[in-house]
Amino acid sequence: MTRLAAGLSIVASATASWAGTTVEWKGSEGAWENAAMWGGALPSRTTDARINGTREKPSQVILARTNALVTRLSVGDGGNSRASLILDGPSLTASAGMDVGKYNGSDGRLVVKSGNLFVGMIFVSGGGGPGQQGHDTIEIQGGTVVTKRIMLGHSSGSHCTLHIVGSKASAIVVEDYLGVGVYNYLEAEKEPPPSATELIFDIDAEGVTPIFTWGKTEGRVRFPIPDNKGNGLGTCKLVLHLLAAPPSGDILLIGAPNQCIGEFTELPEGAPVRAHFENKTYEWKLTYRGGRTKSDIMLTSPRIAAADGRMVPYVTGRKAKSFQFDRAVVESAYREYYRQVDAQQSTLGSGTLAFPGAEGYGAYAKGGRGGKVLFVTNLNDSGPGSLREAIETKGPRTVLFRVGGLIETRGLVVREPYLTIAGQTAPGDGICIKKSESDAAALELSGTHDVVIRFLRIRAGNNTGQFRAESFRASDSENFIVDHCSASWGNPQTLTTGGSLDRFTVQWCVIGEGNNQQRHAFSSGVGGDRSTWHHNLFAHMQSRVPRWGDITVQCDFRNNVIYDWGHGAGYGDLRTLNYVNNYLRPGPSTTQRPPAFIADPKVILPASIYVDGNIMVGKADVGRDNWKGVLAPEGVLTPRSLQSSAPFPAPPVQTQSAAEAFELVLRNAGATRPKRDSVDTRIVSNVRNGTGRIINDEKEVGGWPAYAAGEPPVDTARDGIPDEWKKARGLPLNDPNVANAVNADGYTTLEVYLNSLVVP
């Protein structure tokens, strides 16, 4: 019997620096560890890696001497690209996923000869978008493959192959499902071209290494099936080759706990399938209902062609090698992955907090401390005096507002690190960011670090009819904190984080009223590694309240108030979770039955979720036993086996009981400086009174308020500190050294002034 190799090693050993970028292969053929071919820097845990070539000059990368760990890997995904990656040991990990081929004319190829491949999800020949008609292949000759999901030929017109060669591979394990061919076609294409997918099994004298799908609810094969309009949109052929005379008895091709959806093209249950070796013809019956689960795909009833042409039973003294799924080894793979990720993580900050009251993983973000002061003097989307100009400036900087009102933007992206945005300095009724066009987020952090954002309103909206605009997004960034901000009217999510993230905090924010176009009024994705979410108010969201979105997520989620979610509150993929002293109140739009703190968490290791002190209004039994509010499906891990008896280590947060936090959050969350606006006032009133609902469009609730511009304070030195404040403290009015002078607590005078604006 062959089990997964117990010594599975799946991650890199080299220390990575934070980049949040894509590293591209620059040559033709070469070894992965050749940094020059990557432009001077090897891909790392915090970067994506991309390998592309041309028809005239194809690229081939061989990974044989080093462990490699990246966020996402693409092989031959460009239009008309030709590229291949050969894994010949020891290991390759792409935690967020892998694309093998993608766009029209792509010719991507992944070959696993030996070693261990660990991938979040694998897409071969596209992920369902337009113009993704590649001709791409995965070939597994040996080693071990562990992945969450494999999608083959998911795009109309694509051609792709999954080729399993013999029985040398230790195991091929898919957590969720193996999707082959198109089962979701492109609505925009009136006559979408069909996809063509092949699953090729080369059988040797001991059989072939099977594919195991093991998720209790999702583990299965999904073949192309006609939709309700009769569109089949693709073929999936089974191809058998013989490398030797086959063993007798049954041969397992795909093991699954659930019955497959659809079937191979022109191969119904019991259909004969044939293969040839040395002028001999062998035949089996194909079943989709084999094994103990009655859902394995197998070759049964072997026969061989006799001299007279008749098919007769085939019996030898050799049975096929026996493979079985062993969860313990998958857990071992994840533990090793986490160990290496931990070894590469940045250390937690120390010294001076970002501001008094900053807590959690992002508490020590430096922001613009000690840098220049930049003023936003108008509400323009770009140009001198605009917010865009300020955030795009290089170097440490603190952004202050000299005008209140509504900034309508096509999307602001923070890429330069060491930034503080002090929304509490806006005069009048404060500042609000509104989305004008495109599907980019209204405000985004991308590939940056050490950012502090406070007292800012971000309300994307659907004013142009383009409803796929998120209010705030952070990706590929670390060491940042979002404090006392208000986000609303986003779609598909309103305040969300994803990609390569680490060490961040979202605290004292109001995240409310997602736009429910296409039923996508989703609240927040929680991606990356270590994060703290505390004392936030989530209201009127359909789902993702929040959605933990990565197997690396270590989240401390406490003292939050969640009101009026639709069909689900928290769910998703995670590593560890503290879910402590949160207050959940179902509302008029809540349809989830029974209402739950967390539903269907996707975790690999046991004892990964700690729940304590949470309140579910109307469910006293859930309050007495919080685990009753975790709806974990029965599976390979039983629901109670997910429960941790102790909280996971996390930076300190001043924590109250759920009932106390409810009052504190309703009084203080959101952009309350210089004043709370009518949107947050209405949302808070809804929470207190059990009113309101999920909306489709901000017009249903009156849209953006009018924000008074106000008058900025007199600042003779233009250092960001008003004359009146300096006079009260005996400071000179026009000394250029005052603002950045550092006190005994480590704060500059400018920071002391900014922090004084938010003291109750």
Model-inferred region functions:
Residues 16-105, 240-309, 313, 377-382, ...:
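Solvent-exposed adhesion/ligand-recognition segments of exported proteins
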Residues 32, 85-87, 108-112, 138-140, ...:
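All-beta strand scaffolds that present successive hydrophobic residues in beta-strands
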Residues 53-72, 379-388, 396-420, 426-439:
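N-terminal extracellular ligand-recognition/capping segment immediately after the signal peptide
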Residues 68-75, 93-102, 118-135, 146-154, ...:
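Extracellular beta-strand/beta-solenoid scaffold signature
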Residues 78-84, 90-122, 127-130, 407-532:
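Right-handed parallel beta-helix
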Residues 128-250, 582:
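Extracellular beta-strand/loop-rich repeat segments of large surface/secreted proteins
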Residues 698-760:
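Extracellular calcium-associated, cysteine-rich motifs in secreted modular proteins
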